[in-house]
Design a protein with these regions (language model features):
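Helical segment within the ABC ATPase nucleotide-binding domain
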Residues: 35-48, 60
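A short, proline-enriched helix->beta-strand linker immediately N-terminal to the Walker B motif
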Residues: 14-18
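Hydrophobic anchor residue at the start of the ABC signature
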Residues: 9, 21, 37
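Short, glycine/charged-rich "phosphate-handling" switch motifs in NTP-dependent
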Residues: 68, 80
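A short, surface-exposed alpha-helical micro-motif characterized by mixed small hydrophobic
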Residues: 62-64
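Charged, flexible cofactor/metal-binding loops and thiol motifs
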Residues: 82-152
């Protein structure tokens, strides 16, 4: 399990890169093998000073692996920040919807919890153009000025 990923990592490391782009590197693996590959990538990142652009849809894996997160919707970066900033204080409605879909290993909670639905029509960017706004720390969000005031409250 994970041999293809390990071979791919070894081939990439042979060229002594400063940046590795890892597109869904653990998505087809079972959880125990995912953990092994992620631990290997973290070790290499630390020991070799690598930057890894980690592209994934599994938000639990993203939170575990990342030092900094960018949330994209339709090719546009809509929110970015540290895992703590994004997961504890999401601002963009799309980010909130994504995070609400993360499964919680508690059947009673899962049965009754609600999900946030993202409705892109809440944005009227024909009237007021959006831009990237600084929230705090390393946290930024792509909204119009009036949305920023509304969502920060």
């Amino acid at each position: 399990g994970g041999q293809r990923q390990r071979i791919g990592i070894a081939r990439v490391l042979a060229s002594n890169p400063g940046l590795i782009i890892a597109d869904e590197p653990v998505s087809a693996l079972d959880v125990s093998i995912q953990a092994q590959v992620l631990n290997l990538l973290n070790k290499l990142k630390r020991e070799l000073g690598l930057t890894i652009l980690f592209i994934a849809h599994d938000l639990s894996v993203v939170k575990y692996f990342s030092d900094y997160i960018g949330v994209m919707n339709k090719g546009r970066l809509v929110e970015q920040g540290t895992p703590e900033e994004i997961y504890s204080h999401p601002i963009h409605p799309y980010t909130k919807a994504l995070l609400s879909a993360i499964p919680v290993p508690d059947p009673a909670y899962e049965k009754w919890r609600g999900y946030v639905t993202y409705d892109p029509s809440v944005h009227d960017y024909s009237v007021e153009k959006p831009s990237m706004h600084h929230v705090e720390g390393r946290h930024y969000v792509y909204l119009s000025d009036s949305e920023m005031v509304k969502y920060i409250k």
